[in-house]
């Protein structure tokens, strides 16, 4: 049997690492002084394990809301005699100055800090601790690291754990003392988003051996300084850097470049125009190029071969057949060519193995893959194009598409535009058309990122997209591994008194499905979250608006499901004015048959609880139930459910009947008449989880009419395997099999 998309299991190393991180005190750590987490003295962890621990820890912190961060986690790696760190990747505001200071004694080779806006210039001081070993450094999006906190001087304080972390907004004093002097082994440097106040040329001057430099979104005052690496630099990224003829002239002198990125975001104003002459110069002078990105540039003159002159046949990557004139000078096809947001991506023959653009699915997926980490503004647009492909056409690379969207949503949990487009794309990529090709593990990943989005954003579009995506899953089965979390999020959506109507409808539908066909433990847990009160609040609001819509009906249906054989939830229903709302709904919506059925089904659950039945035994309620026995609404459903409520009440005997009117005998007579009027072969819209509440009414003589109702119910519900008198929606385990036709009571 072929494996489904995304079915590759995690490695044993990954599984063990995650387990240890979730159970630190039971595995490698103990609780020390002042509850500080300490590494056990008999443990030594090599770099392969330490790197994995830190990097997976960051992933769990950012993507798993059930994971509890440890305040002193990074202190576990403070002593290189017991732990060895070499390659660390940290991101987002979660990372603080004290975390870097904790690992300052480690011989780091690679340190990637991305969007770490809680870091101040204290961390620049810490960086100098790694200067003798660091080979690769990324400070992308860490603009606050170049500012002091409130103008305080640089410090690398042993007691920094107790120092109050100030907000980034308070950082105003630019740090001028930091220098890359002594970082002699540094080869790869990413300074994307460097503040305009920092002079890149001065900062970079001490670094003589760089082979890779990223200056995305950096304002360059001059360009000549780049030539100091002309014999070494293999990769240069100048995304969203203001290009000029001077800068291009400098770039083409860097003859050893293998990767050049001079792309831009099209919505960013630029005076520079890409010409055929400039593109030709880049190709002819930089003969070692294997990767080039010119995305977002408007071509000033025509760079493409006229259609009637294009080489015949299928699309080719051979440079000699290139539909783009300058690329005909290439010695070999490029490994990567960025043409996103340019007209060049639409030509027939492009001499590159991997192309970003918007022409087809492959180009769009390449764009998402290339731009997700550092260019969410481009990834957002590419995901939007993938959304159109999945919605209108057909996604042929399903696994890759899902994995890329999931990665984008994880990477940019706090980017609203990514969350909106990503959740919309997931809705179409997980629908029925693609479902059979997806593994359990892949679909669980989708659920996780969808719930992350719901948790982070209360914005209408994100919430709607996430709720709609959840509707593509089998409920409750596929959501059970996140059962508590998804219920909490849905109830939070339904809390506001005024809410988007479509979100309300979807969220209530999901709530209803989640409490249907689950065990009592789950129902009780959800009840304690405020499920019953939330549904009743929705009903109250609809009553005020005098509107009986799907939200109203789904809310009563959800209450019917959550109170099934759960006395605590039934008690909550009564405590929260449930009976008053029942009477108001009956009066306000006398012709809503589905509504009546759901309400009476719920009250049947309440009536099954002996301790609660006295609260139903009032003249007003008994009169209402008795009158509903005559109802022909929804077939026999309303009459049947009303009779069920009364059957349980009658089961308590005449001594419990303390009222004079209506008389017990009169009500019992009406019950007999109602049962006799029902067609025993009626198809019922009901699904009992067990027969126990019905069977409880049989072995007694206090209330024969209750026995009669229970007997009729069982006979109507079972499937006779001989004559097929009735049908039902019960599991096959509830079908009664008779050994011979002579024993069948239907014959």
Give names to the regions the model predicted.
Residues 105, 131, 183, 207, ...:
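Core helices of alpha-solenoid repeat scaffolds
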Residues 88-94, 112-118, 139-145, 158-169, ...:
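Concave beta-strand-loop units of leucine-rich repeat
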Residues 154-157, 249, 270-271, 280-281, ...:
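HEAT/armadillo-like alpha-solenoid scaffolds in large eukaryotic assembly and transport factors
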Residues 2-9, 13-27, 330-331, 337-402:
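N-terminal "cap/leader" segments of large eukaryotic alpha-helical scaffolds
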Residues 22-170, 179, 184-192, 211, ...:
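LRR N-terminal entry segment and analogous cap-like coil->beta motifs
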Residues 101-106, 124-131, 148-183, 201-209, ...:
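A structural signal for leucine-rich repeat
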Residues 135, 181-187, 204-211, 227-234, ...:
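Alpha-helical solenoid repeats of the armadillo/HEAT superfamily
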Residues 365-373, 403-414, 448-458, 488-499, ...:
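HEAT/HEAT-like alpha-solenoid repeats
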């Amino acid at each position: 049997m072929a494996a489904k998309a995304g079915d590759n299991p995690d490695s044993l190393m990954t599984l063990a690492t995650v387990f240890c991180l979730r159970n630190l005190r039971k595995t490698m750590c103990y609780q020390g002084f002042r509850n500080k987490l300490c590494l056990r003295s008999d443990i030594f962890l090599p770099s392969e394990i330490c790197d994995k621990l830190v990097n997976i820890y960051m992933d769990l912190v950012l993507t798993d809301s059930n994971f509890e961060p440890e305040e002193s986690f990074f202190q576990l790696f403070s002593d290189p005699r017991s732990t060895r760190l070499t390659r660390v990747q940290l991101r987002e505001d979660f990372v603080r100055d004290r975390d870097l200071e904790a690992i300052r004694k480690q011989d780091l080779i690679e340190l990637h800090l991305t969007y770490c806006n809680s870091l101040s210039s204290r961390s620049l001081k810490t960086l100098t601790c790694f200067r003798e070993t660091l080979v690769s450094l990324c400070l992308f999006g860490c603009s606050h690291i170049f500012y002091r906190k409130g103008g305080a001087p640089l410090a690398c304080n042993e007691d920094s754990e107790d120092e109050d972390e100030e907000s980034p907004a308070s950082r105003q004093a630019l740090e001028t003392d930091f220098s890359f002097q002594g970082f002699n082994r540094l080869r790869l440097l990413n300074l994307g988003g460097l503040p305009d106040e920092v002079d890149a040329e001065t900062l970079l001057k001490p670094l003589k051996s760089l082979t890779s430099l990223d200056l995305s979104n950096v304002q360059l005052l001059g360009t000549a300084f780049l030539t100091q690496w002309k014999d070494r630099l293999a990769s240069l990224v100048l995304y969203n850097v203001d290009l000029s003829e001077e800068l291009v002239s400098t770039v083409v002198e860097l003859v050893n470049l293998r990767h050049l990125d001079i792309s831009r975001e099209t919505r960013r104003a630029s005076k520079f125009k890409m010409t055929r002459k400039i593109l030709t110069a880049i190709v002819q002078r930089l003969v070692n190029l294997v990767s080039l990105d010119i995305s977002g540039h408007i071509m000033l003159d025509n760079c493409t071969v006229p259609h009637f002159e294009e080489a015949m046949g299928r699309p080719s990557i051979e440079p000699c057949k290139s539909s783009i004139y300058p690329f005909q000078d290439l010695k070999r096809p490029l490994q990567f060519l960025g043409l996103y947001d340019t007209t060049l991506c639409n030509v027939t023959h492009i001499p590159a193995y991997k192309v970003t653009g918007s022409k087809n699915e492959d180009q769009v997926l390449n764009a998402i893959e290339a731009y997700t980490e550092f260019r969410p503004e481009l990834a957002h647009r590419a995901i939007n194009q993938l959304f159109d492909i999945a919605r209108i056409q057909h996604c042929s690379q399903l696994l890759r598409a899902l994995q890329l969207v999931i990665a984008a949503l994880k990477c940019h949990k706090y980017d609203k535009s990514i969350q909106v487009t990503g959740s919309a794309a997931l809705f179409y990529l997980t629908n029925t058309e693609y479902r059979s090709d997806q593994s359990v593990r892949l679909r669980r990943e989708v659920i996780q990122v969808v719930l992350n989005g719901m948790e982070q954003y209360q914005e209408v579009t994100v919430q709607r997209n996430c709720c709609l995506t959840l509707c593509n899953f089998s409920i409750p089965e596929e959501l059970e591994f996140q059962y508590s979390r998804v219920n909490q999020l849905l109830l939070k959506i339904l809390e506001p008194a005024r809410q988007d109507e479509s979100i309300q409808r979807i969220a209530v539908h999901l709530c209803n499905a989640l409490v249907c066909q689950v065990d009592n433990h789950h129902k009780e847990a959800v009840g304690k979250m405020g499920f019953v009160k939330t549904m009743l609040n929705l009903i109250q609001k609809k009553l005020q608006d005098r509107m009986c819509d799907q939200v109203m009906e789904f809310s009563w249906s959800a209450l019917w499901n959550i109170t099934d054989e759960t006395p605590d939830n039934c008690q909550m229903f009564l405590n929260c004015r449930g009976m008053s709302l029942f009477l108001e709904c009956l009066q306000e919506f006398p012709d809503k048959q589905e509504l009546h059925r759901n309400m009476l089904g719920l009250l049947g659950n309440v009536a099954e609880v002996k301790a609660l039945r006295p609260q139903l035994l009032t003249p007003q309620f008994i009169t209402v139930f008795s009158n509903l026995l005559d109802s022909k609404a929804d077939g026999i459903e309303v009459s049947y459910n009303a009779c069920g409520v009364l059957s349980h009440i009658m089961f308590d005997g005449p001594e419990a009947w303390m009222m004079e009117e209506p008389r017990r005998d009169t009500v019992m007579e009406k019950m007999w008449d109602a049962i006799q009027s029902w067609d025993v072969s009626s198809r019922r819209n009901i699904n009992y989880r067990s027969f126990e509440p019905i069977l409880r009414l049989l072995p007694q003589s206090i209330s024969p009419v209750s026995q009669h109702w229970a007997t009729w119910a069982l006979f109507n519900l079972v499937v006779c395997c001989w004559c097929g008198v009735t049908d039902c929606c019960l599991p096959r385990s509830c079908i009664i099999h008779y050994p011979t036709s002579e024993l069948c009571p239907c014959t």
